[in-house]
Design a protein with these regions (language model features):
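Short, mixed-charge low-complexity intrinsically disordered segments
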Residues: 43-65
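Surface loops and adjacent helix of pleckstrin homology
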Residues: 20, 29, 63
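A short, charged, amphipathic alpha-helix used as a generic interaction element across diverse proteins
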Residues: 28-45
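A sequence-level detector of short linear motifs
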Residues: 25-26, 60
Length: 65
């Protein structure tokens, strides 16, 4: 079973780091949010990291079998 971690763009263009209902924090810069959530996911593998943009785009960044 994989764990799912999310970086979600907010209306104010900040980036929210989340796992399930748990919000970890918010970042001003996408790269900072990705670095943070990737570290969390790496500690809880198997895990997948998704980036959700305001334009409804979703990208999978980190997947484990």
């Amino acid at each position: 079973m994989a764990w799912y971690y999310h970086v979600i763009e907010q209306d104010d263009h900040r980036w929210l780091c989340r796992h399930g209902r748990r919000v970890f924090d918010r970042h001003l810069v996408l790269a900072d949010a990705i670095a943070h959530i990737t570290d969390l996911a790496a500690a809880n593998e198997p895990a997948e990291v998704f980036v959700h943009r305001l334009d409804d785009g979703v990208e999978c960044l980190h997947a484990q079998p």
